[in-house]
Amino acid sequence: MNKWLITSGVMLSLLSANSYAVMGKRYVATPQQSQWEMVVNTPLECQLVHPIPSFGDAVFSSRASKKINLDFELKMRRPMGETRNVSLISMPPPWRPGEHADRITNLKFFKQFDGYVGGQTAWGILSELEKGRYPTFSYQDWQSRDQRIEVALSSVLFQSKYNAFSDCIANLLKYSFEDIAFTILHYERQGDQLTKASKKRLAQIADYVRHNQDIDLVLVATYTDSTDGKSESQSLSERRAESLRTYFESLGLPEDRIQVQGYGKRRPIADNGTPIGKDKNRRVVISLGRTQV
């Protein structure tokens, strides 16, 4: 991070592409206005929001996934009219005027889109807020070429909500919808019991379904190996399918969102002439559908 040995009082003139001082608009919550709110706190998503008066909202979000992730969006009441180069600077708070400003990075905000920052830079913004500083976005006003816009995030009342946000991230599920949307599970060689690994996978699916109100369809298809005759295989397959229907209903899913089908020993995916092939054929395929928002 490069340090600019300047105070916040002269930031606007030095950020200008011209050699002369420019007028600027600055959007920031006063200490009395500053709010941070956890608007989503579930095992699937965490969202921390900071309203910026007369401008919009600063939104940090993280979602259930194999990897820890963080997105930052600067949601604007009025979208960008033109694409602009943006300087992201860490500014001292008003009560520490003698401190220097630190350049964090340069970005682009694109026409008709909210501002977006991801990855390490988004984590860096949180880090600056935790230090009590004001991360500030500065760019040329697309409506007035001789004017710059400054949008700052206030660190007032940030820490307690940030602690809650950090706790939420730590408790996110370690898999996403895409990881479980199509799953093949396998049964033990005798009876209706899933293998140990399959039981663990089914429990993961259950955790996701419990916390996601957008799951609107569960498709279950069960298959057997060729050990039994056609009638016995079909009966076993249907029994397994109905058992899973009951399981998903116990999670709170309406009956009309669950479709199950037993196929018996039809549609093998491996050679039933070997134990390994039979193990692969004794399976259930679970597909999830959800409403996209």
Swiss-Prot record:
Outline what the protein does: May play the role of a stator in the sodium flagellar motor, stabilizing the force-generating unit through direct interaction with the cell wall.
Question: Where, per UniProt, does this protein localize?
Answer: Cell membrane
* Span of domain OmpA-like: 175-292
Checking PROSITE patterns in the record gives: OMPA_1, OMPA_2
* Membrane topology recorded in Swiss-Prot or TrEMBL: Peripheral membrane protein
Q: Where is the signal peptide?
A: 1-21
Name of the protein described by the UniProt record: Sodium-type flagellar protein MotY
Q: GO biological process annotations for this chain's record?
A: archaeal or bacterial-type flagellum-dependent cell motility
Q: Which organism is it from?
A: Vibrio parahaemolyticus serotype O3:K6 (strain RIMD 2210633)
Output a single Gene Ontology CC term carried by this record: cell outer membrane
Residue ranges of the TM segments: none
User: Record's superkingdom?
Assistant: Bacteria
